[in-house]
Each structure stands twice: as structure tokens, then as C-alpha cells.
């Protein structure tokens, strides 16, 4: 958050949006994330390092630890917890308690800047189109990977190519 904004700006925004029943996505860490969980965001997306830091640990490297931490975040209010794991893919604990794991496609890391945001965008596009968490995760992993494999953010063609190569469940 820029220094010119109050520390509770996310809370102020979510308080205003709450009556509209808006689905909110939060990609924040630490206290910012903790303070907005009470608003029951539709999706939060920490990476495995941020998730470990949130609980006072190092990076969470295995699925069991990630899922246990994701469950704690759900118990605090998050509806869906999407955890990006870089080359190890992603883990999603959905609001129905189902666990989804996707492997990352093969490719050469060129630039990881924006890959997490691309994953969120792909996930949301997939979910809004299909209402299916598995397909949303597949598109999210494809979009995040396609961005990581490019100098710039991925194009639709880049993402489609990754999907054709296959983004698979773990």
C-alpha cells in the first residue's frame, strides 16, 4: 500500500463493498491479509513462501503443510485459498473443502514478474466461464506459467499453447 493511503484501506474498501455481495479477491500478505479475512473474500492467493511467513514459518514445501495452512485461513474467513508454488504448480483448497493440485507445465523461466497476477486472472476467467474449480485452476496455472515463460505478460495465444501442451493434476 502506498504511504499516502491509510493502513486500513483494504478494510475500508471491503466494508463499502460488503452490502453489494461482491466477490472479492485479495492478493496481500501479513496484517493486510489478516485484517480482511473477516470479510470472507472469495479468493486469496498467497504463494508458498508468503503462506509460511503468515504462520511464522519458512516456505511451506509440501502439500500437507500448505493444505493445513489453507484450512486455517478458511477458518478465519477465506472462501477459497489458491497457493502458487512456482515450478511446483499450485494448490487450491476450495470453499467446498475439496483439494485441487496442478503441476506446472515444462518451460524456461524468463520473468516471474506478474506471474502470480496472471494466475489470479486466469483462475477468475476460468471460474466465471465454467463455475468449476478444477478448470479454473488449470487456466490459472496456464496463465501464470505462460507469463513466467515470457518477457512480458502472456497473451491469449501463449496461454492456449500451454493448455494444448497439457496442464495436469498432481
Language-model features: locations:
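Conserved beta-alpha-beta core of the PfkB/ribokinase-like small-molecule kinase fold
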Residues: 1-64
Amino acid at each position: 500500500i502506498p504511504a499516502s493511503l491509510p493502513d486500513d484501506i483494504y478494510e475500508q474498501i471491503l466494508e463499502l463493498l460488503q452490502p453489494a455481495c461482491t466477490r472479492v479477491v485479495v492478493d496481500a500478505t501479513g496484517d493486510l491479509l489478516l485484517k480482511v479475512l473477516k470479510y470472507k473474500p472469495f479468493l486469496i492467493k498467497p504463494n508458498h513462501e508468503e503462506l509460511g511467513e503468515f504462520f511464522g514459518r519458512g516456505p511451506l514445501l509440501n502439500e500437507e503443510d500448505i493444505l493445513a495452512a489453507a484450512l486455517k485461513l478458511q477458518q478465519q474467513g477465506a472462501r477459497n485459498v489458491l497457493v502458487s508454488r512456482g515450478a511446483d504448480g499450485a494448490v487450491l483448497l476450495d470453499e467446498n473443502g475439496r483439494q485441487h493440485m496442478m503441476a506446472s507445465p515444462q518451460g524456461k523461466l524468463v520473468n516471474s514478474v506478474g506471474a502470480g497476477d496472471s494466475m489470479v486472472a486466469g483462475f477468475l476467467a476460468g471460474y466465471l466461464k465454467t463455475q468449476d474449480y478444477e478448470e479454473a485452476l488449470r487456466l490459472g496455472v496456464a496463465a501464470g506459467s505462460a507469463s513466467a515463460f515470457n518477457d512480458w505478460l502472456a497473451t491469449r495465444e501463449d496461454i492456449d499453447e500451454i493448455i494444448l501442451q497439457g496442464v495436469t493434476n498432481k
